[in-house]
Amino acid sequence: VLEKIYQILKRNRTIIFVNTRAQAELLFISITKKYKDLKFAIHHGSLSKKIRLETEENMRNNQINAIISTSSLEMGIDWDTISQIINIGTPKGVNRLVQRIGRSNHKYYSVPKAVIVPTNKLEYFECQACINLIKKKKYDLIDEKIGSNDVLCQHLLILSCMYGFESKSLFKEIIKTHPYKNLKYSYFLEIVSFVFDGGYILNNYNKWTKLKKDNRNIYRVNDENNKRNIIMNIGTIIDNSNIRVTLGKKILGDVDQNFLNFIKKGDCFSFSGISVECINISADEIRVKKIKKKTLNVPVYWGGNLSLTKSLTNEILKIFEHNQFENYPSKLQNFVKNQEDKSTLPKQNLVLIESFPYKLGSYLVIYTFRGRQANQTISNLLTRTLIDNGYSPLNYILNDYSLGIFINSKVRDLEG
């Protein structure tokens, strides 16, 4: 696969899109190790702003041949120097893939060009499903968002720090916005009560009282300490603590705090496209030095997986149901035939469940085609249920399409 990618890169200035930051680092290591005649760069959200801007400037000035990037280059990049997009796998949805493809040939009368590279057999069908949906112009539906309580709470707190608010007039203003158009006044008053003193559960504790109400029924923040805390903590995004990575005086970027659990002084890892050795660790910083030795150890980031969209899932299952694989590569035809001989192909509105013996136990495999996050939740619930029913699940594995649980029981015991 790398050789085919290399042949494309020799003819085209390219952005290679991947789905995770760890995948970007690993691909950069592999491709730069093998092909030294081309200039590559890496781009993702955990690199420092300075490094990202330098990379963008180099690509704009034709100083590099390809950037390996996550979704950090999906939006707002209008370079006419990019003639080709390569996407490793799919970004788990049609809309995002179309957006990525649109980064190429960004000039009048030009046609965007892209190559999709599946990384396994099932992902081949996912890539084909994406292409089918794009040809039919069937894009992912964007769900209507209902206004979130935490956003509304923060809005009330911020208003209280400014000129205050009166509940009835503010309610009339809020329901004019689309996300809160169905908000009931009684529920809105519960939100106000919660912001005022913690609501009916916490109103007996003074520390939760943040607002005061004057004789004109105007709510305002009750003291300067609360005002300062509110202003300093504006925002609703859950922030995972990050640790800064520095090379000398240069900040390379950030890694998740949990990376500290897997690294110690003297360990080597790859970050920002270079191999480094850890020389010092503190509570908020990992200091490193550059080394020549290549290493495949890379930081893994919390929340890095994209969710498989419903429309793409349904299109994959339609491909299996139509069962027309004559034009597919022989390896894919053999893969499908082997599945049909031993079991059956997954179908829409049905969940395929398989079990088979393995060593002293057996595997229970469930094909959900609902994405990694859904399969993670199902695995946790099913593991708990099996334990409650006297079984001994030892481990589970999962991907976007299925989950497998290894159980310390024979298949006949499970069926019984």
Regions found by a protein language model. Give the residues of each.
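Terminal, basic amphipathic appendages of nucleotide-handling enzymes
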Residues: K136, S148, N240, I281-V351, ...
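C-terminal accessory/connector segments of nucleic-acid motor ATPases
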Residues: Y139-K264, C268-F269, S275, I281, ...
